[in-house]
Amino acid sequence: MEPRPFLILHALWVTRATLGRYVGHDVRMLYAVIPAGGSGTRLWPLSRAGHPKFLHPLTGTSASLLQATVERLAPLTTPDRTLVVTGAAHVAAVARQLTVLPEENILVEPSPRDSCAAIALAAAVIATRDPNAVMGSFAADHLIRDTDSWVCTVQEAVRGAEQGLLMTVGITPTRAETGYGYLETGDPTEGVPWRQVAEFKEKPAAEVAEAYVRSGRHLWNASMFVWRVDVFLAELARQQPALHAGVAAIAAAWGTPEQDDVLGAIWPTLPKISVDYAVMEGAATAGRVATVPGDFGWNDVGDFHTLGDVLPTDDAGNVVLGTEAKPGVLLRDSSNLVVVPQSGRLVAVLGLRDLIVVDTPDAVLVCPRDRAQDVKTLVDELKERGEEGYV
């Protein structure tokens, strides 16, 4: 079921004066970019290519992850400075959920080209509006529990960006996680809230992750970025000149009658590469990247097990997503379940524990919670079998 339209009164979007609640001096307001792509294959069959996870209410409220992301940005920016980059298949759903955004702030990518093309396009479009802008890029499908702490952390990143650094927001690790990439940082400097990023690290093996956490020098890479658009675009031109030239040409035509033709001609030629690989790793080697460590209850909602860890439970540790669904669920002598009833059928479970049960109109998933990461292999197999209608 799609969340109700997101009706935010403009009064909820704060002014510069209100930002004093978060920081000690007046700061410029961000341009916020929300890349909204990917299908969330570990959340199949709830999340599908045609209705990915960011459009679902996985927040414990009626708001979708995308809506929660926009609401979280209210102390940092305004609707006219908030841009969403999404695929053509999702434009209508994004517009329905984000009625407060101007139509022209939903940027459409004709096909997925990974994160660098999407973020670079937004940066280039913003640069045509304000060449001196500071922009932040924040994923559409993450959960953050402590919004005030997150806002303060982002504002510290803005200060670094104003000095010409390519900033990230790193997450202080709470466990030796093997499903995330890491940022290797330098030592803290007294009086400076950020640390230099020495290297971006791939997802590690368990023993390596444990060493990272023990070191105190490694943070989770949450793919949150803050920078001046001129600095980012200059770094993009240095490392990825073809991609830079492409998005610059698209941005030059943006808002003109030639926009669609230029976008359609150039977009398929852009390299398909993440912004980490394309820009940030090389910039870190050159000493141009810094990070602000954050501890604000971040979660990437990567699979159903994770969802079960962050949403409210009953006395037996069971999580039911969408408790308003009818006829709903009937759980007896069962514990530590994640149940997602989405078909209109009754879901009944008796005498089981540590399972994921997802019931949709055309597919049912049942698996142990500790196999949640492997759900994506089912999606891969369905694709191999040519059963794209299920994915």
Protein language model regions, located:
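Residue-level signal for inorganic ion chemistry
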Residues: 66, 122, 141, 183, ...
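Left-handed beta-helix
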Residues: 12, 18-24, 28-29, 229-391
